[in-house]
Amino acid sequence: MNIIVSGGGTGGHIYPAISLIEELKKRDKDNKILYVGTEKGLESSIVPKLGIDFKTIHVRGIPRKINANSFKALKELFQGLREANKILKEFKPDLVIGTGGYVSGPILYKATKTKAKVAFHEQNSFPGITNRILSRYVDKYFVTFKESIKYFKNQDKAVVTGNPIRNRFTDIEKNKKSALEQYDISENKKVVFIFGGSNGSEILNKATLNMIEKISNQDKFEIVLATGKLNYDEFIQQSGKEIKNLHVYPYIDDIDKAYAVSDLIVTSSGAITLAELSFLGKASILVPKAYTTENHQEHNARAFEKNGASKVILEKDLNSDTLFDQINEILSDDNLLNELSENSKKMSYPTACKDIVDELYRLVEQDEKA
């Protein structure tokens, strides 16, 4: 089967695509897969390194308000549509699937005019504009949150699957002992892992910095903080190197180990992170990043809060007092900690990848039988 996968711009769109590619290859090693992205997007540096065939088209996000960039964006969109058409004619896909980001718009839209079956996956509780438009044309679409379906057209084509994540997080508990040693943390203490995504979060760093005295003067928990590479030197300069109960790192590559030792996670609410937290059944305090597209991070966080899986603090309300008090409240009440953890697990879709690929195969097979 010839399959085109498209999605890009951020890791939140790219890694679900990679997860689906891995499952499609596992299902049939003869599946021929082409990833379509943009040259400027993060996908151009990630996807080719994985040995996946990669082609680019020209496209950029169209500004919501008309400005000097609007004409350039429209010009690139039409160029991208022509390039998408050329790729489709040459590759002749049986199936085209998008995972979001404006790059997937031209290739999926043009694919709906061919014999290929077309589908997309939406990671966020409030869907992006590209997928909202595409819902009018595709054969099927998959969502992480059932709350997002109301924003789409053709709601009978929606399937709730959760967010596909890679299999690096299976059985992380076996790493817990070595991870505790790595972070030099006592087995008798609870652990809070604070991070703001791959680039860190200045607002989380500042709140942590300002509660150093409180952290040092208690013996209930220890904190592992990933500041982000660009923020690390400044944090250490302001905090000093040795702080009781606080372990500071610029970036954590083996995040599975950090998850393994943690009882409570404090983080932003990107779709991939939430999929990981629910897969692992981790209690969390979510601090959605303000000013994200369509404010999607707050929508994601509220979905978890509504289901009793997390506590939410908005960035405008975050300071050392609100954060420390919330951490202390959760870790002082084992019933609350367990409840958050159990409800988080209930939001997990551990077979998301398999379920999506099953549906995709059914979609193609229905067409063949017809």
From Swiss-Prot:
GO biological process: carbohydrate metabolic process; cell division; cell wall organization; lipid glycosylation; peptidoglycan biosynthetic process; regulation of cell shape
Tree of life domain: Bacteria
Sequence positions that bind UDP-N-acetyl-alpha-D-glucosamine: T10, G11, G12, N124, R166, S198, I252, Q297
Membrane topology: Peripheral membrane protein
Keyword Ribonucleoprotein: no
One annotated Gene Ontology cellular component of this protein: plasma membrane
NCBIfam families assigned to the protein according to its UniProt record, in alphabetical order: murG (TIGR01133)
The name this protein goes by in its record: UDP-N-acetylglucosamine--N-acetylmuramyl-(pentapeptide) pyrophosphoryl-undecaprenol N-acetylglucosamine transferase
Gene that this sequence comes from: murG
